[in-house]
Amino acid sequence: MEVKVLGPGCAKCTEAEKIMTAAIAEAGVTATIEKISDFQQIAKFGVFSTPAVVIDGAVKCVGKVPGKAEALAWLRN
C-alpha cells in the first residue's frame, strides 16, 4: 500500500502525516508513506486545497486533516 500526504508543510499537513503514520501502525498494514510538497506534483492529483491524502492513487481527503477513525477505515478497505 502506498500512502501520500500532499501539502506544503504547514501545521495541518504535518498533523495529517502524523495521523496517517499512526493509523498505518494501528491497522497493522504494510504501507509506505510519502510527503509531497511540490505544487506541480500535487496538482497532478487534481488537488488544489491541502492537506490531502492519497492511498494507492485514489484521493481520499482534500482540504482537511482526516480523523484517525477515518484513516483506519481507508487503510482497512
Q: Language-model segments: which ranges?
A:
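Local sequence-structure signature of Cys/Sec-based thiol-disulfide redox active-site neighborhoods
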Residues: 1-22
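Terminal leader/tail segments of proteins
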Residues: 2-3, 30-37, 73-74
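Short, surface-exposed acidic/glycine-rich loop or hinge patches that mediate macromolecular interfaces
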Residues: 10-11, 36, 65
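Conserved helix-turn-beta segment immediately C-terminal to the redox Cys motif
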Residues: 19-32
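Acidic, metal-coordinating helix/loop segments flanking the phosphotransfer/catalytic sites
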Residues: 41
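Structural micro-motif
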Residues: 46-53
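Non-catalytic, surface beta->alpha helical segment in thiol-disulfide oxidoreductase systems
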Residues: 55-77
